[in-house]
Amino acid sequence: DKFETTQLVAKPVSSSLASIFGKADGKSAMVEQPGWIFSGVLQEIKVGDPLITEETSSSAKSSIVMPMARRVKVINFNFTVSGVTNEIKTVSAALGGVASKIDLTTGAIVAGNQAASPVTLTFNPAGGTLQGTVLIFGNEAELSDEVRNNLQFAFETESGRRIPLEEDITEQLKNSGGAEGDLQIKIEGSLDVRYDAGLMTVVIEWLRGSEEDLEGL
């Protein structure tokens, strides 16, 4: 990570992960989003103001109270998985259109710095679940209608094949509270792994009413 005056910038992902998705949505560079970032700022300090300073001893020494705010959002993905799940070895994903830079004094994302970030996934074929989490500074799609949040999956099969699946989830993020600045965003859906005429396919359906998409190898 690096600081540029009051701005914090996300760092590039490892080359091995970046090679899986490339630019993810064709425009965004892949970056590793931050951990739990908190920041705060005081425009001025008034000695004696009980909201800012407080006495710590009888000798009237004062300490500065700095209000802090969380500067990252959490997107939680929860999928039920059905079908021939034993054929899927690993699942990777990346979310495009997220912000890669933030102003630490205000918490506002710095516009024009869209990126894609990897999603941490846990796949449980026996339990029929796929869960993922990604931390983001914010969503560039909130600032521009031209920016889309494309979620890219890469399913690796036991036979070594790779099944790509890309979904535009811009509206799902907005409908889940992402556009209103919620710090916790929940996205749910279902995945069905099928064999159709000898072709393995993955069908995804979103809980919030999006149409099905179908991709396969």
Give names to the regions the model predicted.
Residues 1-70:
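Short, low-hydrophobicity acidic/polar segments
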